[in-house]
Amino acid sequence: MSQYVPAEGFVSNAEFLGKLISSAPKFETVSNGKKEIFYNIPAGFDIETSSFYYHGEKTAIMYEWTFGINNIITYGRTWEHFKTLLAAVTAVLQTHQNRRLVVYVHNLPYEFQCIRKHFSWTKIFFLDNRKPVYAITDKGIEFRCSLKLSGKSLAATAKDLTKYKAEKMAGDLDYSLIRHPETPLTEKELGYCFHDVKVILNYIQEKIEQDGNIARIPLTNTGYVRRYCKNACFPDEEVYTNASTYAEYEIDAIGVSRDERVLSRWLHARECPPSREIMYEGWLIRLYKFLSIRFGSKKVSDITRKVSWFS
């Protein structure tokens, strides 16, 4: 993988594509182990909008977009220009459903309400109503939420950068002004747009280097907690990744029958035997998609023997 050098300024759409064409053969790709390949490079997208009321209903107009791949950043003023550019990007990188470019957006739920009608989507994952954490187009562009990953504002995320510094410009755009795609923008205003995407690119590049590759970056910051718990509870990766072996391991580790294990995957419960000699403990396990706390019957001697399991 070539050395990452942060972007220094905007380039035109034509220069952006020219640099992308010359750089594309050098871009590394990685697999997530599920027959899906990702470009192991940072990419970011951001828009600026003006909100106002029209016939009593609140609406918004996108008047500027910024798009960056690796260390190349460009901008435009209309959706048509962005769609034309993105179509060219997918052609250059030859992306499709199993060969994707991950594009991070800081606060994807907001941007998605603006872009959802401009593309065809094959898969969208929502954490809540109208709150997607990722969305995949039919051309293999996967938009992800960097806000869910960092858990912080863009300004706070910029302050946390350690290797690739990129401070968010002081202040912000004057959102009280109503702008549209033909409204002239000053160099200072364009500077805000540039630095916002530069922060995203530098942040994702640091995550790529810290996590090993882009396929290992979780969707949200809580994914790191789940990964830590999995590694702590099941340090043997071969046992964990082999489904049948893992099932036997789980049955032996928590002392349940095969029938009880099958039921627990759906009911998350177990009958409590009426015995004074039994007390109930809980421990973290991985059932279906989420970490759960399973309560099972154990003798006091068994519990004291397993106390070190949590330390």
Regions found by a protein language model. Give the residues of each.
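Metal-dependent nucleotidyl/phosphoryl-transfer cores and adjacent nucleic-acid-binding surfaces
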Residues: 1-311
